[in-house]
Amino acid sequence: MSLEGKQYYFVAYDYDTSAIFAIPITDLRDETIIIAFTEVFEELVEKGYTPTFNVTDNQATTPIKAFLKKKNCHWKFVEPSNHRVNAAERAIQTFNNHFISGFSSTDTNWLLQLWDQLTRQAVTTLNILRKLRMDPLQISIRTAEWTQI
């Protein structure tokens, strides 16, 4: 547990931008997940990439359905054991590997309870390294936008 009470990461993946999002959360209640989900959705809209389709596992299905319906976004829910269909599963692995490698390079005297303070740096460096699936001419624009997160 972090000093701010965070215990988990909410990790999301956007296919078009190939961006991975990670938000430290306190618990796995529906309300907490929908707040993190909304934060990711709003950030994508703010950057000009409005999601139109969402694939997710069955966690917090009712609130996510209601949210996506309000945003005119289609959705598909996959069973939790089917990791091949959900591209976010690979994004979770990628984020975990990147975060752990960065975490292991911290000072040996650094407080482990501050792990959630590394999130912004980890997400920024991870997304700068990823390739864009959209128009290659937008790469420099995307890099400038995502580094301002």
Can you annotate each of these PLM segments?
Residues 1-97, 132-149:
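Retroviral integrase
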Residues 94-106:
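A polyampholytic, Gly/Pro-enriched intrinsically disordered region
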Residues 104-149:
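Charged, gly/pro-enriched flexible loop segments at helix/strand junctions
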